[in-house]
Amino acid sequence: MPTTMQALVGAESGGYRLAENVDIPVPQRGSILVQVHAVALNPRDAKIVDFSNAPGSLGGCDFAGTVKKVGEGVTRFKEGDRVLAVTFGSNALDKTKGAFAEFALAEEDISCRIPEDFSFTQACSIGLSMATAGLAIFQAPGLELSLHGGKGEAVLVSGGATATGTMATQLLRMAGYTPIVTCSPANNALCQSYGAAACFDYHSPACGADIRVQTNDSLRYVLDCVTDTTTMKMCYEAIGSSGGSYIALETIATTVKYTRRDVRADWFLADAIMGNGVQMAGTYGRAPSPELRRFGKQLFALAENWLHDGSIRHHPLEIQDGGLANMPQALNDMKLGKVHAKKLVVPILGH
């Protein structure tokens, strides 16, 4: 096995650069070293190097591959196992953590064994959307819904055709809730195929009011996967007159937040699921949270079962070849909005 690798790391001037001869990290207690076969790209990967760059740190979150080494105390996995995992790259606290490399570290309890009928390109798209949707729906400061016993109550997912949106729709269905979504009419069939009970056109100025009518003024819970001023206003209009909870994936506009005192509004970072705290600029920093790590362990154990019994599906994929060398271009395509209703995936092994 080699001792060095290629990796995409934070550049001193911002953005990423392709680095040669990067030391392959050593798995510590509770972690595994994975030879990366494929990675998925997420908006976080493009944004983070602009607002909280960590030069020299490995980039990326979503990956899948084969286990090459296991750290002390690891019992779930062995060398040769096919796994998917999520990590949080561009991490100033630990620059060896990141997915955009030929080898990547994963935490044993924030990883899943891949079903035999799953390819690596499919599997690598699961981790971050699972972590994000799971935290948003089931944990504070998210909606804090029950993993079981939803009793059919409607929950709105704004951005139902995003990767987090389709995952959230599936998780809500399994927990007994009735997911309704906003999306473009062109994506109605896509969202319905993941379990959306109703789709509303976010282009319509009456979108929020229409949802409020259709839910009989009773909507209490909203997950906003888009998170801008327009979608936040729409979500506020949709929530019933008794108030409710709104959770976002980005910082939220206070100009909208305080227009309704009966709505609890907050936002979160999926990075917090690792429990180690988050060192980022401004309001993005997070204190350590063992409770969130315990939830992450529970969630990924469940996710492994759901994958193997077919309860959840991955988001539609767009595969770009070229390996690590093509990653800056792929990230730029995503940043410019050239990818719609698909998860961008790049095969690594063999490129």
From Swiss-Prot:
Oxidoreductase is among the record's keywords: yes
Pfam family, one: ADH_zinc_N
InterPro entries in UniProt: ADH-like_C, ADH-like_N, GroES-like_sf, NAD(P)-bd_dom_sf, PKS_ER, Trans-enoyl_RdTase-like
Metabolic or biological pathway, per its Swiss-Prot or TrEMBL entry: Secondary metabolite biosynthesis
Entry EC number(s): 1.-.-.-
Protein residues bound to NADP(+): A161, T162, A163, T164, S184, P185, A186, N187, Y202, L249, E250, V339, H340
Keywords: NADP, Nucleotide-binding, Oxidoreductase
Domain annotation Enoyl reductase (ER): ranges: 10-346
GO MF annotation, one: nucleotide binding
PANTHER family associated with the record: HYPOTHETICAL OXIDOREDUCTASE (EUROFUNG), TRANS-ENOYL REDUCTASE APDC
Function according to Swiss-Prot or TrEMBL: Trans-enoyl reductase; part of the gene cluster that mediates the biosynthesis of gregatin A, a fungal polyketide featuring an alkylated furanone core. The PKS grgA synthesizes C11 and C4 polyketide chains in the presence and absence of the trans-enoyl reductase grgB, respectively. The polyketide transferase grgF is then responsible for the fusion of the two carbon chains to produce the furanone skeleton of gregatin A. Next, the cytochrome P450 monooxygenase grgG accepts performs the oxidative cyclization to furnish the gregatin scaffold and leads to the formation of desmethylgregatin A.
Family according to the record: Belongs to the zinc-containing alcohol dehydrogenase family.
Protein name as catalogued: Trans-enoyl reductase grgB
Organism (species): Penicillium sp
Gene that specifies this protein: grgB
